[in-house]
């Protein structure tokens, strides 16, 4: 596992939870994740859950993605998706507002791998270099991804060659993220 990425993700998650605690006096609250089982759930309200990050349980890799395409996935991506279970976290990188995607549970991890495979299928069909997404943006056609060839974090427009490099590594990207509440 890429320890720098794992440490940077944990540090950002701590910054996010601390900012939430300071603003709201509680652990993060999510309406979107209400009713979805997870080891992260601390308590529930009538229509939302309070969550706390938990250590990832299970095989710490995205080998299903590697097997589906007979490729080696960047070590940073293995770390990103298997360091912890947590809720998605709104954040800002420079001028880019985004939602950092996280795995909520073991079932969610399987779904994420299936979505990553689907993303790669589309890229292969369009003859685009392989990327694996890590965050969404308000414009649903734009995502933040890691280029599987270079390891760079990029902003890309889905289905096109429009790509902008944001950071040289995933650890660097995570270190520069700021919580957005």
UniProtKB/Swiss-Prot annotation:
CDD domains: Syd. InterPro entries: Syd, Syd_sf. GO terms for cellular component: cytoplasmic side of plasma membrane. Gene3D superfamilies: Syd protein. Disulfide bonds: none annotated. HAMAP family: Syd (MF_01104). This is Protein Syd. It comes from Salmonella typhimurium (strain LT2 / SGSC1412 / ATCC 700720).
